[in-house]
């Protein structure tokens, strides 16, 4: 991914790792995932640029994607003007009084930071949020038209009905908590630990993504990720992941300081939610105590981000031996996975610890816990009092956001999560031109060529390892704009008068679609982002990249902008995603996507040493006296930023090698490229959200991502940066991995 989790940092990532953009911001969670929602995620046919008890139904058939209709020829018109400034860069957003060599972020973006107010409904604001606002408006038009079309049929009717049901506030108020009552009654009827285990299995959903989107969070007891097998990427494996917390991370339960106050607010939130739902005799204090016990056995974010530690294959029979406590037969039966022979258990100690708690903690405590999470997850689809209470904690207390998003924005997000590709098909027809795709495809080809040249020039790497690296690069497949085939939603029931039911059925539909992959060959044309999603993705287990249509907008990409700015922004994003195939996680996968060591021991030691130096560099960034960037946590994204920007610079020079260097408004091509990079990472954040991101986001804050330039030799003469300035690094201290 390019983006992060809070609206503070949206990052580029890999392997179903959302690299650029963000997972849902806490206060803007997709109602569809019925909580601070998993990633709010989604470029044309993936073109090669080189050479259990499962539901009876198989994965829904996909429909081949059609290219957007060609635009009609029109009379010649004046060349379009860039959206920003005279050549694609917002020079009014600079602070020219700040020396570039002391604080490049302030130099490039200080004026923007000073004049920009964070919208009241956001925890932070940046380039991703800016583009996402436009994408939301464009999507709203599509949904409004579909909802108003009473003669609509097929997918158009489904998206219109889903959106209309969410927008029907009067209908939702009239029903009260009744749509959720069957689930609450089922929880109340649980009579023993076997029934509890089956009920916990029934809550399992495909709501995490370990490698592509680096989305590890679920409030369900465990998360499930269906993806190619680490050791045999021709087939799928189910990955079981720790979960069970209502707050974002273990530190919120175990640390002191502001976390202690947040725990008090969380307990009060739990009590209010249960009272609103009329759940009798529930005990908020013991729910918090149970979640605290779960947090104590959780693996840390850094441990969870370690692929090699996560590659633990368990046979179904191993669960009872290695993780006693939970009735695993009942759990897997409830999850529809009883016939599955093997699993990959990502955090085995946490899974064992959570399982033991099922046996240890009283049944009534678990029933209270399940009831609370059922209501809290559904709050966006229940009367206003529920949604307001959910936002009061997750939006305001946790992230510092004063105002909830307008209902139409929440409806757009919910609709995208439920029917994202059906909406994306219409979005592409309206908002993604063949000209934009062609120019982006050319940029990709230039970036791949430049990255190959950087591999050839890597003096620290042996010929043997270079050969394998070049093979991996040659096998990289890239999708631009939209998927080559569309998902089939015909089996999903959507009713215009059932907002909560629509969300629950969509979530279950997606879960069943995922577990139906087991035993099937891997579909290497499936997309994990929607075209209207502002992000990008590297999929390490398939050696594949995808770039949705929506990210190809200013300030990342502008067809009317100067090429240097486009390469500094979108070119670096593309380079970032390519580089994820060779970062500290991507480097563990070979050209087929298999977890395999293709390095010589000496080369890998040198690679790790360079990574350690970069982690140490980012450890020095301290946005608060008591909080710093965790360089180990952000290392994969930081490697991709350094390599992506360096590759974008080389690709621009390659594309313009036969053209004279032109100065525009006093800026040289090199200056424009680096300013384009910094502009892409302009950002502001509320303190609570900023602090949360430092704990949980694998992307460094945008302010520090922009300072990646200090590792690029060409930046120094471009801005006359001298020894003694704050961002100056001696040549030997500049990290060059690729």
Residue ranges and their predicted role:
Residues 59-79:
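Post-signal peptide N-terminal segment of mature Sec-exported envelope proteins
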Residues 78-81, 322-325, 337, 344, ...:
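Intrinsically disordered, low-complexity linker/terminal regions across diverse proteins
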Residues 13, 19-31:
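Short, Lys/Arg-enriched N-terminal segments with co-localized hydrophobic residues
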């Amino acid at each position: 991914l390019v983006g992060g989790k809070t609206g503070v940092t949206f990052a580029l990532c890999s392997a179903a790792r959302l690299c650029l953009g963000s997972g849902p911001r806490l206060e803007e969670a997709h109602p569809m995932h019925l909580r601070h929602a998993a990633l709010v995620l989604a470029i044309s046919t993936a073109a090669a640029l080189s050479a259990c008890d499962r539901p009876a139904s198989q994965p829904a058939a996909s429909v081949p994607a059609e290219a957007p209709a060609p635009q009609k020829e029109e009379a010649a018109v004046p060349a379009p003007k860039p959206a920003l400034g005279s050549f694609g860069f917002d020079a009014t957003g600079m602070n020219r009084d700040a020396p570039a060599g002391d604080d490049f972020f302030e130099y490039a973006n200080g004026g923007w930071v000073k004049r920009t107010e964070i919208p009241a409904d956001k925890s932070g604001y940046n380039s991703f949020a800016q583009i996402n606002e436009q994408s939301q408006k464009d999507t709203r038009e599509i949904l409004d038209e579909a909802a108003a079309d009473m003669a609509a049929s097929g997918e158009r009717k489904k998206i219109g009905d889903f959106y209309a049901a969410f927008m029907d506030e009067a209908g939702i108020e009239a029903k009260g908590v009744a749509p959720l009552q069957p689930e609450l009654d089922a929880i109340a009827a649980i009579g023993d630990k076997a029934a509890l285990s089956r009920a916990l299995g029934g809550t399992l959903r495909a709501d995490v993504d370990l490698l592509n989107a680096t989305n590890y969070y679920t409030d369900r007891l465990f998360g499930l990720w269906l993806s190619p097998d680490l050791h045999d990427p021709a087939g799928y494996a189910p990955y079981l992941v720790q979960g069970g917390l209502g707050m974002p991370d273990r530190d919120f339960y175990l640390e002191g300081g502001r976390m202690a106050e947040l725990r008090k607010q969380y307990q009060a939130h739990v009590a209010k939610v249960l009272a609103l739902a009329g759940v009798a005799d529930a005990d908020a204090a013991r729910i918090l105590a149970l979640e605290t016990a779960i947090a104590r056995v959780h693996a840390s974010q850094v441990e969870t981000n370690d692929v090699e530690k996560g590659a633990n294959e368990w046979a179904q029979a191993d669960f009872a031996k290695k993780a006693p406590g939970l009735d695993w037969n009942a759990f897997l039966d409830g999850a529809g996975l009883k016939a599955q022979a093997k699993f990959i258990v990502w955090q085995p100690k946490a899974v064992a610890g959570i399982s033991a708690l099922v046996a240890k903690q009283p049944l009534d405590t678990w029933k209270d816990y399940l009831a609370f999470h059922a209501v809290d997850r559904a709050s966006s689809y229940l009367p206003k009092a529920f949604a307001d209470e959910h936002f009061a904690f997750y939006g305001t207390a946790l992230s510092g956001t004063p105002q909830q998003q307008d209902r139409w924005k929440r409806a757009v997000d919910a609709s995208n999560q439920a029917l994202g590709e059906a909406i994306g098909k219409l979005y592409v027809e309206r908002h993604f031109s063949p000209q934009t795709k062609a120019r982006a495809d050319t940029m990709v080809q230039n970036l791949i060529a430049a990255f190959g040249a950087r591999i050839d020039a890597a003096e620290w790497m042996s010929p043997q390892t270079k050969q394998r690296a070049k093979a991996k690069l040659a096998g990289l497949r890239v999708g631009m704009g939209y998927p080559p085939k569309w998902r089939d939603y015909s089996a999903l029931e959507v009713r215009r008068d059932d907002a909560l039911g629509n969300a629950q059925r969509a979530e279950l539909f997606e879960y069943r679609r995922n577990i139906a992959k087991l035993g099937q060959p891997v579909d290497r044309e499936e997309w994990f982002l929607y075209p209207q999603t502002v992000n990008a993705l590297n999929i390490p287990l398939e050696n594949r990249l995808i770039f949705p249509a929506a990210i190809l907008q200013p300030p990342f990409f502008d067809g009317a902008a100067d090429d240097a700015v486009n390469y500094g922004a979108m070119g670096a994003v593309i380079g970032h995603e390519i580089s994820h195939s060779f970062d500290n996680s991507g480097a563990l996968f070979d050209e087929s996507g298999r977890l395999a060591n293709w390095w010589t021991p000496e080369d890998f030691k040198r690679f790790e040493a360079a990574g350690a130096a970069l982690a140490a560099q980012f450890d020095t960034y301290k946005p608060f006296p008591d909080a710093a960037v965790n360089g180990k946590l952000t290392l994969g994204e930081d490697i991709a930023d350094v390599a992506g920007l360096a590759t974008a610079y080389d690709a621009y020079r390659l594309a313009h090698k036969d053209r004279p260097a032109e100065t525009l408004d006093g800026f040289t091509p090199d200056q424009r490229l680096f300013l384009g990079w910094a502009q892409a990472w302009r950002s502001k954040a509320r303190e609570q959200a900023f602090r949360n991101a430092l704990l949980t986001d694998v992307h460094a804050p945008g302010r520090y991502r922009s300072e990646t330039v200090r590792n690029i030799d060409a930046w120094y003469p471009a801005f006359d940066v001298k020894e003694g300035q704050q961002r100056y690094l001696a040549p030997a201290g500049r990290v060059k991995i690729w």
